[in-house]
Design a protein with these regions (language model features):
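Active-site-adjacent loop/helix micro-motif of nuclease/hydrolase catalytic cores
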Residues: 637-641, 655-675, 697-698
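Active-site metal-binding core of divalent-cation-utilizing nuclease and nuclease-like domains
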Residues: 576-579, 601-653, 664-666
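Conserved Class I SAM-dependent methyltransferase catalytic core
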Residues: 87-99, 103, 195, 335-397
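Positively charged, polyanion-binding regions of nucleic-acid-associated proteins
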Residues: 418-458, 508-547
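Interdomain/boundary linker segments immediately adjacent to catalytic/signaling cores
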Residues: 535-537, 551-622, 779
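Domain-level recognition of nuclease-like catalytic cores that cleave nucleotide substrates
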Residues: 693-779
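Charged low-complexity interaction tracts in eukaryotic proteins
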Residues: 411-425, 460-521, 553-576
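Nucleic-acid modification enzymes, centered on SAM-dependent nucleic-acid methyltransferases
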Residues: 1-34, 38-300, 307-339, 377-380, ...
């Protein structure tokens, strides 16, 4: 199950528990399906599904996901297609090697002007080709890419029969649709299309071949903007690339649930079973589904999904490319409108769609709307939900680890919240920053702000206006430019890199733990999911669910701190038991190192009974015979003090508070809460003993959060990489001054004045007594 399906499975959990006779009474509907994610999620919850594909290519994609062909059968069918059209595939793409003169098949020609490819004597500026003879001699085909002197690709007008077939395929399409391909490409594509029409393959295999040919045609189309360099890819090469991509998809595809059947007949929804009905989206499909739901009271719609956004130009290009596979229809205008980036257009189209699907709303399904991270789209979606009498919550998503998106969920019968009062923009943004707990850009706050604004409008009975709401969101995105800098003591202040934060006293007192701490815990949970071999996508969905979210750099750093990707598969760097074992071993090393440096040591009571190497940590502590209570404990919050992993101290001198972290890294909790409750003075030093893999994450968080960096400085914190504890232990006679050479992210390349232990009375040789300091004997 991919991440999109995992997210929908989680969304279905509340719906699947509503009181009905059986789960077979439940139906999920995707009105703009681009993949089979909802069908897979529904099968996991033992529900049926109806998927309305946006266009032909999406319909073929969904069919290939839910009923994938075997790789061997697909390869055989693709090879037969290539063989059938082999003569036409070679025409116009034959040349010879400039080095050895052997015949080669050109894979692509480069043109400085895309339209030059159709000139009878046009000369390309480069070519791509591979010479088998040269490659056998170790030249790697490099000479084959060298053009012949004054080389001109063979061109010529299309034969009348070919031209007639091409014109018939693009009848009714936009003007110039066939001109997206050169004459050479048209001749080969016509041969492939004709071969596909004559194919006797099964429906499943035929759909896979149609999808492959359409993808190849879209990949080699001429650029729409004039004046751009264009590589005219040979159809045989484009088709081989598309076949290879499809083969990899089928090889890596996860098994489809055995109970998931696929049909194109809506009447199948009235039969028991966990099947999926896949049809082409449009007015006819929506009307038929609404009629079926109206006439079949036993069917209850649990979830209604709509996808907004994308590229309307891309949708048009796909529809034109699909004509080579026999698809003549154009995309539904309502679905095209949903791919706009205009708030008014989206709100109008989505509102019409919800009205048309009113029979499906009888049992108050969960409405799930996926959209791009775009203010106009967000304004349009929330406006449409407002017009339908509801309000929505917004979550972030990363379905592919690269492209951010948003998901709006709503139940249209949900009553308005009680007691919500209209608030100013600054006041609402301040509360969002307070809840987030760390500096953030207004753009990151936009989804949470929009959802809060929509809830307030719903509570007051106000209907959102798409255009005005979009303008308001644009103002919020530009809020940084309107704020004053730090030192103004305003509710909100402007920081570097376009971020904002709170500076008012009331807001500072209410600041929550940084949201990055919660995200770090979610990233760490991924390790456990990977160990168990399940729930990986669910863990990633939880990591990205915060509507405010985090920067891509921080997200990447968190994932890299605990996991790595090898051959496209994510693996944990270390298991959770191994991390805990390492943490306890480091704590034991500190407790043994302290007495060798002439220090007393104590350990957190929660760790005292834990055994390491056959000896408990509590047995490694040394107590001052005169004062058994560690320094500053009586002046501190007892619970916070006792939570410190290890304390190394010398009575009358100073204290080393040591926190050992191997994962997760709750740096906000440590700096802003636990150690804020522990008394301090000028001789207190705090050491964060950190696993090396977490060091980049710590550095990034300190650099991006002024509150954390200020607490780091004021608390006299210093970084000690965990592997340096063993290095110190290997010294014959370790001293506190030796500690300085091991501090920092990359010791010994550090700021020389990072920690001056000598000025605090720490760097005294044994047997020496500094002036004015009473030396207490150690037991």
């Amino acid at each position: 199950m991919d991440r999109s399906a995992a997210r929908l499975t989680a969304a279905l959990a509340p719906s699947a528990t509503s009181p009905v006779a059986t789960t077979q009474d439940h139906l999920t509907v995707d009105l703009t399906a681009r993949s089979g994610a909802l069908a897979l999620a529904s099968a996991h919850r033992q529900l049926r599904s109806a998927l309305h594909a946006r266009d032909a290519m999406d319909e073929w994609t969904i069919a290939a996901e839910l009923r994938p062909p075997t790789v061997r059968a697909y390869e055989a069918a693709a090879a037969e297609l290539l063989a059938t059209a082999s003569e036409a595939l070679d025409a116009g793409w034959q040349s010879s090697c400039a080095a050895c003169g052997q015949a080669v098949r050109v894979a692509a020609w480069r043109w400085e002007e895309a339209l030059d490819a159709d000139q009878e004597r046009g000369q390309p500026t480069a070519r791509r080709a591979t010479c088998a003879a040269c490659r056998a001699l170790g030249r790697r085909g490099g000479d084959a890419a060298t053009m012949l002197p004054n080389e001109v690709p063979s061109a010529g007008l299309l034969e009348p029969a070919v031209r007639a077939r091409v014109d018939a395929r693009f009848a009714g399409a936009v003007d110039g649709a066939a001109a997206r391909w050169s004459t050479r490409q048209l001749r080969s594509l016509d041969a492939l299309s004709s071969a596909l029409e004559r194919s006797s393959e099964s429906a499943v295999m035929l759909g896979a071949l149609r999808l492959t040919l359409s993808e190849a045609a879209a990949a080699m189309a001429r650029p729409q903007r004039a004046g751009r360099t264009w590589w005219e890819v040979a159809p045989w090469q484009a088709l081989l690339d598309a076949i290879d991509a499809r083969r990899r998809i089928y090889l890596t595809a996860q098994p489809v649930p055995s109970q998931l059947t696929m049909s194109s007949d809506l009447s199948a929804l009235t039969y028991p079973g966990g099947g999926a009905v896949v049809v082409r989206g449009g007015v006819t499909a929506r009307t038929s589904l609404a009629t079926l739901i109206t006439r079949t009271p036993a069917i209850r719609v649990a979830l209604l999904r709509v996808t907004v956004g994308g590229s309307a130009d891309e949708l048009s290009d796909r529809a034109i490319a699909a004509r080579w596979s026999g698809e003549q229809s154009d995309a539904d205008p309502l679905l095209v409108a949903l791919q706009s980036n205009d708030a008014v257009t989206i709100a109008s189209a989505l509102a019409r769609l919800l009205v048309a699907m009113n029979p499906l709303m009888r049992h108050d399904p969960l409405v799930v709307i996926d959209l791009d991270d775009h203010p106009e789209q967000l304004a349009g979606v929330l406006t449409a939900i407002s017009l339908a009498g509801g309000t929505g919550s917004v979550l972030r998503r990363f379905d592919d680890d690269r492209t951010p998106g948003l998901t709006v969920t709503a139940r249209l019968s949900e009553p308005p919240a009680i007691g919500l009062q209209p608030r100013s923009q600054i006041s609402l943004m301040s509360d969002l920053v307070v809840a987030h707990g760390e500096p953030v850009t207004p753009r990151q706050l936009l989804p949470a702000y929009a959802a809060a604004r929509a809830r307030a409008a719903h509570a007051s009975g106000e209907l959102l206006d798409a255009a005005a709401f979009a303008d308001e969101l644009r103002d919020v995105a530009d809020l940084h430019a309107k704020l004053r800098p730090a030192g103004s003591f305003d509710q909100l202040i402007a920081l570097a890199e376009g971020r904002i934060f709170v500076e008012g006293r009331a807001e500072r007192e209410r600041l929550a733990t940084p949201a990055a701490d919660r995200a770090d815990a979610a990233a760490f949970a991924l390790v456990g999911a990977l160990e168990a071999g399940e729930g990986v996508d669910e863990a990633l969905v939880a990591l990205d669910a915060d509507p405010i979210g985090m920067s891509p750099e921080l997200r990447s750093a968190m994932l890299d701190a605990y996991t790595s990707v090898v051959d496209g598969v994510r693996h944990p760097l270390r298991t959770v038991p191994a991390m805990e074992e390492e943490r306890l071993a480091i704590a034991a090393g500190l407790l043994e190192l302290g007495p060798r440096m002439g220090l007393h040591v104590s350990v957190a009571p929660a760790l005292a009974s834990t055994a390491v190497a056959g000896r408990t940590l509590g047995a490694r502590t040394t107590v001052d015979p005169i004062d058994s209570s560690p320094p500053l404990r009586l002046r501190s919050d007892r619970a916070a003090y006792d939570a410190v992993d290890a304390v190394l101290y010398r009575r009358g001198r100073a204290v080393l508070f040591c926190e050992v972290v191997t994962g997760p890294l709750p740096i906000g909790e440590l700096l802003l809460h636990r150690h804020a409750l522990i008394a301090s003075d000028r001789e207190v030093v705090r050491l964060l003993v950190l696993a090396p893999a977490l060091v980049p994450l710590l550095q990034l968080r300190l650099a991006r959060d002024e509150r954390l960096s200020a607490a780091w400085e004021s608390g006299n914190w210093h970084l000690l990489a965990a592997d340096r504890v063993a290095a110190l232990s290997r010294l014959a006679a370790p001293r506190l001054t030796d500690l300085e050479g091991h501090l920092g992210a990359e010791p010994p390349a550090r700021d020389a004045a990072q920690l001056d232990l000598g000025s605090m009375g720490w760097g005294v040789e044994r047997g020496e007594t500094p002036e004015g300091v009473n030396r207490e004997p150690l037991s």
